[in-house]
């Protein structure tokens, strides 16, 4: 398994490097990367999720679906609680503490997690990784969006409306399909599957393009960023692996969950850090460094997780 993960991570890193070169050469600018992001989040990801739910693995018991979703949500909350004492020990300022705890708790399950699970575990991995989507969205709303906002008179209705994205809707539809046993077949399934093939390369190209416009050297000079990456990509997912060992679940299911939980810092941390002026430099650089070191941390983490599980 570790060798397979390393091979897939290297392939994804090569795709990321291609995006980096395209960005450096000016072939894809920020506007182009934003357009690719829209296609990925609003078209390719939803098609990928629905196609996966229509596969053979869509026959999993619905009770197991609920348990896996609860496991994701529980881990997000547990990671948040575990990092708060660490932030206090480090005597971080309020904004730094907020970014620190949320960076460690919230993995990039979308851009990195689902493509990586798909590459390593196939259709089964897509389904298991996609079950993190509604949980991650709920966590983002309750623990990130509400925490990062400074003003108290915000429009709750508008915030709830912002959660109605194609990706979230498709994740809910996937859960309904798993509960009812209904599947796409024939031409519709072929269409969804064809569009789904664009997920992995597109997501890696986007990350590479975004990295090309960032100060990479500066990111490697901050000790606090290494601690965030260590906790986010190694310590927290391995804690989850120890807990999952006692669930009695299928080993592949546990490994896939751990893989999602071991991904780099979610890009939304940088977005909200900049938008609400909550330690924006730390937020952006934590996302950047964890992505840069992912080709090292992910294979190492999965190598250890295999032995735990």
Task: Identify the residue ranges that each predicted region occupies.
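Alpha-helical transmembrane segments of multi-pass small-molecule/ion transporters
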Residues: 1-309
């Amino acid at each position: 398994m570790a060798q397979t993960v390393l091979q897939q991570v290297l392939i994804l890193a090569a795709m990321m490097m291609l995006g980096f070169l395209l960005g450096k050469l000016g072939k894809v600018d920020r506007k182009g990367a934003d357009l690719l992001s829209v296609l990925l989040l609003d078209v390719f990801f939803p098609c990928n999720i629905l196609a996966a739910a229509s596969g053979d693995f869509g026959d999993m018991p619905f009770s197991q679906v609920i348990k896996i979703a609860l496991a994701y949500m529980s881990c997000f909350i547990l990671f948040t609680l575990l990092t708060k004492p660490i932030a206090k020990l480090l005597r971080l300022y309020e904004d730094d503490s907020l970014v620190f705890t949320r960076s460690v708790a919230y993995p990039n399950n979308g851009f990195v997690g689902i493509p990586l699970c798909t590459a390593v575990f196939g259709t089964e991995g897509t389904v298991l990784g996609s079950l993190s989507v509604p949980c991650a969205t709920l966590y983002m709303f309750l623990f990130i969006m509400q925490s990062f906002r400074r003003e108290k008179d915000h429009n709750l209705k508008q915030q709830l409306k912002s959660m109605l994205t194609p990706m979230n809707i498709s994740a809910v539809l996937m859960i309904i399909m798993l509960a009812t046993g209904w599947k796409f077949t024939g031409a519709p399934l072929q269409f969804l599957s064809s569009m789904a093939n664009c997920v992995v390369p597109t997501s890696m190209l986007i990350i590479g393009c975004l990295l090309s416009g960032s100060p990479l050297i500066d990111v490697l000079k901050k000790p606090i960023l290494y601690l965030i990456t260590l906790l986010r990509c190694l310590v927290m997912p391995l804690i989850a692996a120890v807990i999952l060992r006692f669930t009695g679940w299928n080993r592949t299911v546990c490994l896939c969950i751990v893989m999602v939980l071991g991904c780099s810092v979610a890009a939304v941390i940088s977005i909200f850090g900049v938008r609400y002026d909550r330690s924006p430099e730390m937020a952006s650089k934590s996302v950047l460094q964890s992505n840069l070191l992912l080709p090292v941390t992910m294979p190492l983490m999965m190598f250890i997780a295999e032995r735990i599980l």
